[in-house]
Amino acid sequence: MKRFPTIKIYDTLSGQVVDLVPVKEGEIKIYLCGPTVYNLLHIGNARPIIIFDAFRRFLEYIGYKVTLVQNFTDIDDKIIEQAKKENLPFEEVGKRYIIEYWRDMTALKARAFNFHPKTTNYVDEIISYIKELEEKGYAYKAENGDVYFEVEKFSRYGELSHRKVEDLKVGVRVEVSEYKKNPLDFALWKASKEGEPFWESPWGKGRPGWHIECSVMSSEILGDTFDIHAGGNDLIFPHHENERAQAIAKSGKDFAKYWMHNGMIRMAQDKMSKSLGNVWYLRDLLKKFDSDVLKIFILSKHYRIPIDVSEELLRNQEVSVNRVKESLNEAETFFNGKVPCPQKMNYFKEQEEYLISSLSNDFDTPSVVARIFELSRDLNKALNSRDEETIKNNYYIIRNIYGSVLGVFETNEQIQKNNVELNQLMEIILNVRSALREEKLYNLSDYIRDNLSKIGIEIKDTPEGTKWS
């Protein structure tokens, strides 16, 4: 039986640094709240992607099987508003910005997560989920046609945000409605207004509320109880509090065992957000800076603290990142293009132990980033003195251990290797689907297409053949 190192993380629910004990030994399942796809990603959206891409890589490095889900919210008030501005169907807005998301992820050189479900692919499951909450007495239909979750019926409400219900009623910003029994009650289903998209339901025409989608998609893909729910700390209340309430009310189980939240990115001390209009789009940033500059900038600060960002701060980071890149390039030149793999010595083992010890301590990436810079300085000294053993050791550690785990300073070959498994799997799936269509087994062919769509993979049959994205 494999022995795993003890990993400590800060759990928002308990308010303490705790040992991460998986629900199932050897496996860790994570749900990360994703973007509402009505605009381009900004640097604030990129922070959790960078953090949890690295966290996933670390868990895999020490031997865990990791399933990481990030959703797309593709039906929402903001999307409807954007569709009106552009005079487009709301579906087209969502599709466009999901495509732009993947372009930005490619430019960021971030690995795709295991599943990227879309809300609109889970409306039937959402309706069933709400019906069950209604049957159990946690939901009610209001006079305006909306269906609300009744907070007073759930005695554990406020546990995640560490607030009491009576305190929450005063001074907390929630969606106001005269039709609610309690100001804290939140919409599970919103009745459609004229000109808005809708789905048929037992409560009339409408669409899902914001909070219900994540509870449904996470439970459908990861099960009623999974290991970690993650996201920005601005989501703790009300979004994650509401997610947790409706999930536990429905299943009677604990939903996410642990909750991890990253701090915000600020411009001039203000939280960055599209709605505030003070955003720095990731695409524009990556035209000015290499993706490693942004990744190192974010990973050099602890994931839970807020980060102030400016072009000057990123320029300063760029200088140190370029020094590392130059030392790695010089090492490759020293060995005529390919640095030989070193023998596993005590030094090699010590560096690996430092990596694991640091990242097991509430994901202390700043210590690992600092060690990369230290190793790079030693690499430069070794290049000057032509110390071949140190050159090989430090190059390998930066490229293949520290860099590979954090997702920085990777070669093109390493980046391509990260994507090859999905491409190979999709080739097999499409070949199977083509064989089914040749046998006129269209129901099975459509089943594959529809279920791939649920996890964010779109299949299109064209005259030139079947394509996926």
Curated annotation (Swiss-Prot):
ATP binds at residue 274. Its EC number is 6.1.1.16. A motif ('KMSKS' region) lies at residues 271-275. Zn(2+) binds at residues 33, 214, 239, 243. InterPro entries: Cys-tRNA-ligase (IPR015803), Cys-tRNA-synt_Ia_DALR (IPR015273), Cys-tRNA/MSH_ligase (IPR024909), Rossmann-like_a/b/a_fold (IPR014729), tRNA-synt_1_cat_dom (IPR032678), tRNAsynth_Ia_anticodon-bd (IPR009080). This is Cysteine--tRNA ligase. It is an enzyme of class 6 (ligase). It catalyses: tRNA(Cys) + L-cysteine + ATP = L-cysteinyl-tRNA(Cys) + AMP + diphosphate. Its cofactor is Zn(2+). It is found in: Cytoplasm. GO terms for molecular function: ATP binding; cysteine-tRNA ligase activity; zinc ion binding. It comes from Petrotoga mobilis (strain DSM 10674 / SJ95). The gene is cysS. Monomer.
